C-alpha cells in the first residue's frame, strides 16, 4: 500500500513526507541531515530506503540511501519518469536495465534513463548499500 501512496502523492503533487508524517516540508534554503536522522520510506518492495531530504520543500531530486539484502531472485523491473543516479557505497549491486545486467561495486556509479525497465538487487553474501538520486 505504501507504494500506492507514493504514486498517489506524485499524481496529486503532494509531498510524500506530508502524507507519511502529517507535516508538510517547510525548508527551502538547506536541509542538513545528521547520521541517524533520515526518514524511512517504502517505495518498492524489497528495498530499504532512507530519505535524505525529507523536510526540504518542493524538491526536484529525491536523494535516498538504499540497503538491499542478499537475494538470488531477479530484480523486479520498474519504470518511472525523470533521471536516476546510483552510487554504490558498500557491497556489490546488479542493475538490471532492460535485458542487460550491469554489475557495480563499491565506488562505481551509473546515471540512466529510468523510463526503461530497471531494477537493482544485491550481488553477493553481504548487504549492498548505495545512494540513489531520482529526479522526476
Give, region by region, the residue ranges found by the protein language model:
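Conserved small/polar residues in nucleotide/adenosyl-binding loops
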Residues: 1-4
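The alpha-helix within a helix-turn-helix
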Residues: 9
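Ligand-binding loop in jelly-roll beta-barrel domains
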Residues: 47-48, 59, 105-106, 114-136
Amino acid at each position: 500500500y505504501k507504494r500506492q501512496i507514493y504514486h498517489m502523492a506524485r499524481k496529486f503533487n503532494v509531498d510524500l513526507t506530508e502524507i507519511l508524517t502529517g507535516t508538510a516540508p517547510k525548508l527551502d534554503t538547506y536541509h542538513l541531515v545528521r547520521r541517524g536522522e533520515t526518514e524511512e520510506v517504502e517505495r518498492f518492495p524489497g528495498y530499504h530506503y532512507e530519505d535524505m531530504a525529507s523536510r526540504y520543500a518542493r524538491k526536484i531530486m529525491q536523494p535516498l540511501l538504499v540497503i538491499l539484502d542478499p537475494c538470488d531472485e531477479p530484480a523486479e523491473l520498474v519504470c518511472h519518469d525523470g533521471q536516476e543516479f546510483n552510487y554504490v557505497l558498500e557491497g556489490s549491486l546488479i542493475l538490471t536495465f532492460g535485458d542487460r545486467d550491469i554489475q557495480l561495486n563499491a565506488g562505481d556509479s551509473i546515471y540512466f534513463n529510468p523510463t526503461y525497465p530497471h531494477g537493482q538487487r544485491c550481488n553477493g553474501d553481504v548487504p549492498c548499500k548505495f545512494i540513489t538520486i531520482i529526479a522526476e
